[in-house]
């Protein structure tokens, strides 16, 4: 009579190595983002003078790379090592951290819907604050130029917002050649032109409004962003729902792996 062998609880190799493989990619992406951010700061001399971090009056886009890279690095490290070494502490940390991010995203989405007007005012303030610092940082300048070109807009609510910048304002004390003008990214594009005319915005705001509409974008970036959001609401909502489902899936997998590991240890 052959004896029956009892097969105890096992750790799922599929779940273990799926979490490991996914987080290895996440980890390396985090390192890449951090590397880009630190390289950008080194190029701007920030690493040799840390106090200069607070000198910029506007938003430094490098912070996006550093914050996103830091979060991805921490998550990737915890998920990767936790799965490979079957470390329940790191796996639980991974689940909790991912859960906190999910909760913050959900809270931000609800607050953005409830306080739409307040968000709009803050966006207006944010853009105008960065308009003031347009020439202070090359990364900020490139971000503003990209935004205005992509959404075909100028300023927060119109081209006159550029009066806030010391180089573009129309005051008599402004001796800049850019006086009463706008950046080239506000200019309407001629498809036949291959070379960008960086002086196309000179004196643009001295012209009558009818003539301004021919040479520059007169709509503000806040209303243009609102329009873009309404036109692409299904896509944007789909992306956010997809990210949320991935986060929930990651939490469930990590918790499943923790349960397997604890069950195996309990059977020893």
From Swiss-Prot:
Glycans are attached at residues 49, 169, 174, 232. SUPFAM superfamilies: Tetraspanin. Disulfide bonds join 153-221, 154-186, 170-180, 187-200. GO terms for biological process: positive regulation of Notch signaling pathway; protein localization to plasma membrane; protein maturation; regulation of membrane protein ectodomain proteolysis. Palmitoylated. Residues 39-61, 114-232 are extracellular. Part of TspanC8 subgroup, composed of 6 members that interact with the transmembrane metalloprotease ADAM10. This interaction is required for ADAM10 exit from the endoplasmic reticulum and for enzymatic maturation and trafficking to the cell surface as well as substrate specificity. Different TspanC8/ADAM10 complexes have distinct substrates. Promotes ADAM10-mediated cleavage of CD44. Seems to regulate VE-cadherin expression in endothelial cells probably through interaction with ADAM10, promoting leukocyte transmigration. It comes from Homo sapiens (Human). It comes from the Eukaryota. Interacts with ADAM10; the interaction influences ADAM10 substrate specificity, endocytosis and turnover. One of its GO terms (molecular function) is enzyme binding. InterPro entries: Tetraspanin/Peripherin, Tetraspanin_animals, Tetraspanin_CS, Tetraspanin_EC2_sf. It holds the Pfam family Tetraspanin. This is Tetraspanin-5.
């Amino acid at each position: 009579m052959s004896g029956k062998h009892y097969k105890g609880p096992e750790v799922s190799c599929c779940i273990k190595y799926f979490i490991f493989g996914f987080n290895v990619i996440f980890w390396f992406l985090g390192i890449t983002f951090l590397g880009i951010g630190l390289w950008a700061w080194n190029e701007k001399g920030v690493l040799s003078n840390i106090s200069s971090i607070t000198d910029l009056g506007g938003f430094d886009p490098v912070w996006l790379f550093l914050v996103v890279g830091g979060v991805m690095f921490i998550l990737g490290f915890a998920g990767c090592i936790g799965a490979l070494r079957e470390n329940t502490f790191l796996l639980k940390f991974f689940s909790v951290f991912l859960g906190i991010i999910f909760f913050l995203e959900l809270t931000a989405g609800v607050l953005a819907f409830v306080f739409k007007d307040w968000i709009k005012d803050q966006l207006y303030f944010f853009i105008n604050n960065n308009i003031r610092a347009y020439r202070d940082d090359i990364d900020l300048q490139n971000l503003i130029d990209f935004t205005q070109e992509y959404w075909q807009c100028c300023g927060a609510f119109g081209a006159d917002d550029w009066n806030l910048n010391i180089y573009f304002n129309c005051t008599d004390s402004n001796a800049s050649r850019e006086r009463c003008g706008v950046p080239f990214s506000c200019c309407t594009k001629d498809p036949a032109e291959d070379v960008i005319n960086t002086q196309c915005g000179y004196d643009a705001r001295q012209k009558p409004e009818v003539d301004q509409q021919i040479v520059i974008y007169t709509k503000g970036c806040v209303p243009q962003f609102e329009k873009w959001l309404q036109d692409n609401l299904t896509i944007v909502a789909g992306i956010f729902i997809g990210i949320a489902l991935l986060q929930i899936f990651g939490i469930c997998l990590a918790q499943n792996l923790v349960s397997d590991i604890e069950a195996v240890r309990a059977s020893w």
